[in-house]
Amino acid sequence: MKTIDLNCDLGEGFGAWEMGNDAAMIELASSVNVACGFHAGDPDIMRRTVELAKARGVSVGAHPGYRDLHGFGRHPIAGLKASEIENLVAYQIGALQAIATAAGHKVTHVKAHGALSNVACEDDMTAKAIAAGIKAVDPSLIFVVLANSKLVKAGEAANLPMVHEVFADRAYEDDGNLVSRKKPGAVLHDAKAIADRVVRMVQDGAVVSVTGKVIKMRTDTVCIHGDTHGAVEIARTLRQALKDAGIEVAPFKRGA
């Protein structure tokens, strides 16, 4: 039986402000990526999210981003040196590791957020700096990378365990990168269409771009954004579609 991990970005509120329905999404995901305070999240939200994950038996990963609360980590920050990127990644991983330890859970993976990830997918220096930050903290942490991107090469060079990610609710360009959120149609919302699309991704090991180009991609984990409108319905519909197709949802493992 084929298996696939469903990952979701959670803990992305701040103070009294909430983003998405974390309690519902965590029931449908097999792994979660927790905001670590730079683009969203704070110590209390991080703790609650980790405790929810522990209670549900869901693996937890750090979701580091640029220091950009105002822009939710979706604004690229130019001019950062490799050492600065490495340090901001290491800092955020360490913060979540401390919270996870306090909650009796463990951080298993790292997935870069928003603009940090988008820049790294096309920029060698940023990709290598993220990988270096992970390796410096714990070389056994799994690096979640956008399939076919520069993050893959950076992870390989750093000898990090990796899982390759595709996105359920995002459109793809012909080069395999995600369509910018600034463009119409970048974020998908039709639950049935998304579910059918993901089943094909898992079965075929490929995604279809906005122009209809078929791009072969290793598919270890599928991301559903918790802040996407209708995220809970999308996740429920997707899980049922995977079950109907004989595909088991299960957390990814080291060396997947």
UniProtKB/Swiss-Prot annotation:
GO terms for biological process: carbohydrate metabolic process. InterPro entries: Glyco_hydro/deAcase_b/a-brl (IPR011330), LamB/YcsF/PxpA-like (IPR005501). Catalyzes the cleavage of 5-oxoproline to form L-glutamate coupled to the hydrolysis of ATP to ADP and inorganic phosphate. Forms a complex composed of PxpA, PxpB and PxpC. Its EC number is 3.5.2.9. Belongs to the LamB/PxpA family. It comes from Bradyrhizobium diazoefficiens (strain JCM 10833 / BCRC 13528 / IAM 13628 / NBRC 14792 / USDA 110). It comes from the Bacteria. Pfam families: LamB_YcsF. It catalyses: 5-oxo-L-proline + ATP + 2 H2O = L-glutamate + ADP + phosphate + H(+). Keywords: ATP-binding, Hydrolase, Nucleotide-binding. GO terms for molecular function: 5-oxoprolinase (ATP-hydrolyzing) activity; ATP binding. This is 5-oxoprolinase subunit A 2. It is an enzyme of class 3 (hydrolase).
